[in-house]
């Protein structure tokens, strides 16, 4: 045909059999990619430390989605939660990956079958024998089936009636596990961080889909509405489908970037707003103060803090710190976290306890300033030594650690104090192994950041695609000089060659 690359879909325009075939092939490619990508991630994933080296710093993209739906065990005898087990069963990580690859092969065969046997009686009007698809009814069938799937997921899988449940955790991402969920039908069901809303919303949306699908199957649109919305044109279907896809992409970009019950921090990493608000810092401080109120020492209070919680309170795990052109997982930047050194407390020669002001998200460099409990600057690392008044040496600052591997250790050497002051600017202090992955020390983004960027980009492209195809559909007659009042339907809808006076016409 000599078609340009952006017109190649023209070959399936009047061919519903091969139209189905290319969609089957596309689904086969998606399913095959998912299974293959899962196997690749499993080959490089290190499950040895679920606290300091979980899946998100390792750049896992497919595994978190499998995990949140109930897959936690591997045929390699490890579990993402660290629990022990004897038999992972069929639906392990590898089992799900292989199932997707098998499904891909079956879809590939189905695509070939529909490409060969393209001219089915199903696509022809029994009365006239002409090619005809009832697109409003096809829409109803698709809506009904998707509603049934959505309802079944909410009723059976999420609630644990016939399925494992979904990933449930506490607000600070410490106790995550798979468990059944009870639907939330009250006002709390609109809380984006309430897992019960996932069950109730899938049930409600599924029921709505069943009702709407049944309506579109049984009720016929008026002729005026049919013509007005171009319901007989396959490009209307394309435009509407793109609208559904780009809207979904915008929604999931929001739930991923801002955080929600469906994007747990244990699987996708923390959000940037948790760093901006000092979310984990406040919780750690609250726990320490509670321990001190119970009579514990500073060492005991900080020693009770989980390294997993402390690891969230580190700026390198902020997805907004990684640039879009810094490829690779977070571990390629910082390295692999091996230990929490402990909480650093700085003390000047007057006995004031000082803390380092933390770096905001969108700064690459930031002055190292040490403040007392009243927010008064007591020490800093000056840019110009000649003009310094609050340097570490002048103020006589020492550092002492509580909790972690440096518990009760103290340092008074100015160079060492400066080193840990710079580290404290980035949150809790950790020891990283950079040699294993030859990490370069430059921050990377987490899968949360990449998912958001990718889906926002495609949503924007698909938005313009929706406008383009919608405009082509609505204004086709105006642009092509085609009479909109036609009785015969060709090309799934209305089509007439310019100057054709043989097609029957009827005024609406």
Curated annotation (Swiss-Prot):
GO biological process, one term: photosynthetic electron transport in photosystem II
Cystine pairings recorded for this chain: none
GO molecular function per UniProt: chlorophyll binding; electron transporter, transferring electrons within the cyclic electron transport pathway of photosynthesis activity
Main location per the UniProt record: plastid
Transmembrane segments: 21-36, 101-115, 140-156, 203-218, 237-252, 457-472
Location(s), subcellular: Plastid, Chloroplast thylakoid membrane
Keyword Transmembrane helix: yes
Cofactor note: Binds multiple chlorophylls. PSII binds additional chlorophylls, carotenoids and specific lipids.
Membrane topology qualifier: Multi-pass membrane protein
Keywords: Chlorophyll, Chloroplast, Chromophore, Membrane, Photosynthesis, Photosystem II, Plastid, Thylakoid, Transmembrane, Transmembrane helix
GO CC terms: chloroplast thylakoid membrane; photosystem II
Keyword Zinc: no
NCBIfam families linked: PS_II_CP47
Subunit architecture: PSII is composed of 1 copy each of membrane proteins PsbA, PsbB, PsbC, PsbD, PsbE, PsbF, PsbH, PsbI, PsbJ, PsbK, PsbL, PsbM, PsbT, PsbY, PsbZ, Psb30/Ycf12, at least 3 peripheral proteins of the oxygen-evolving complex and a large number of cofactors. It forms dimeric complexes.
General function of this protein: One of the components of the core complex of photosystem II (PSII). It binds chlorophyll and helps catalyze the primary light-induced photochemical processes of PSII. PSII is a light-driven water:plastoquinone oxidoreductase, using light energy to abstract electrons from H(2)O, generating O(2) and a proton gradient subsequently used for ATP formation.
Protein family according to the UniProt entry: Belongs to the PsbB/PsbC family. PsbB subfamily.
HAMAP family to which the protein is assigned, alphabetical: PSII_PsbB_CP47 (MF_01495)
Name this polypeptide is given: Photosystem II CP47 reaction center protein
Native species: Euglena gracilis
Encoding gene, per UniProt annotation: psbB
């Amino acid at each position: 045909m000599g078609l340009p690359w952006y017109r190649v879909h023209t070959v399936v325009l009047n061919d519903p059999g091969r139209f189905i075939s290319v969609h089957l092939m596309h689904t086969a490619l998606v399913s095959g990619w998912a299974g293959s990508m899962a196997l690749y991630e499993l080959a490089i994933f290190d499950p040895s430390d679920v606290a300091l080296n979980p899946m998100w710093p390792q750049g896992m993209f497919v595994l978190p989605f499998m995990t949140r739906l109930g897959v936690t065990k591997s045929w390699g005898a490890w579990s993402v939660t660290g629990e022990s087990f004897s038999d992972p069963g069929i639906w392990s990580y590898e089992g799900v990956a292989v199932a997707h690859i098998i499904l891909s092969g079956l879809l590939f065969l189905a695509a070939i079958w529909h490409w060969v046997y393209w001219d089915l009686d199903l696509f022809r009007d029994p009365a006239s024998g002409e090619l005809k698809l009832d697109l409003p009814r096809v829409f109803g069938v698709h809506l009904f089936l998707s509603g049934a799937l959505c309802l079944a997921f909410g009723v059976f899988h999420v609630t644990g009636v016939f399925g494992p449940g979904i990933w449930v955790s506490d607000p600070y991402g410490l106790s995550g596990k798979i468990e059944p969920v009870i639907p939330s039908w009250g006002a709390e069901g609109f809380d984006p961080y309430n897992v019960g809303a996932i069950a109730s919303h899938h049930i409600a949306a599924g029921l709505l889909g069943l009702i709407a699908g049944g309506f579109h199957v049984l009720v016929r649109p008026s002729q005026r509405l049919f013509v007005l919305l171009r319901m007989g044109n396959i490009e209307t279907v394309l435009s509407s489908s793109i609208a559904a896809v780009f809207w979904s992409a915008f929604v999931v970009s929001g739930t991923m970037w801002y955080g929600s019950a469906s994007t747990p921090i244990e699987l996708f990493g923390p959000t940037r707003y948790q760093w901006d608000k000092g979310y984990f810092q406040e919780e750690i401080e609250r726990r320490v103060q509670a321990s001190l109120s119970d009579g514990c020492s500073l060492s005991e209070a900080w020693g009770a803090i989980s390294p997993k919680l402390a690891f969230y309170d580190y700026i390198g795990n902020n997805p907004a710190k990684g640039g879009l052109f810094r490829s690779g997982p977070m571990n390629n930047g910082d390295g692999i976290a091996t230990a929490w050194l402990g909480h650093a407390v700085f003390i000047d020669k007057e006995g004031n306890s000082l803390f380092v002001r933390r770096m905001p998200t969108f700064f690459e460099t930031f002055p190292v300033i040490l403040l007392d409990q009243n927010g008064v600057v007591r020490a800093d690392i000056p840019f110009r030594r000649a003009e310094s008044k609050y340097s570490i040496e002048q103020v006589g600052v020492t550092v002492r650690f509580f909790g972690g591997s440096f518990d009760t250790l103290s340092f008074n050497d100015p160079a060492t104090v400066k080193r840990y002051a710079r580290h404290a600017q980035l949150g809790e202090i950790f020891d990283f192994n950079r040699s294993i992955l030859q990490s370069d020390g430059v921050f990377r983004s987490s899968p949360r950041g990449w998912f958001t960027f990718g889906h926002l980009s495609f949503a924007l492209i698909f938005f313009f695609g929706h406008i383009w195809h919608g405009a082509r559909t609505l204004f086709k007659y105006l642009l092509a000089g085609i009479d909109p009042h036609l009785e015969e339907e060709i090309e799934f809808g209305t089509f007439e060659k310019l100057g054709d006076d043989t097609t029957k016409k009827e005024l609406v």
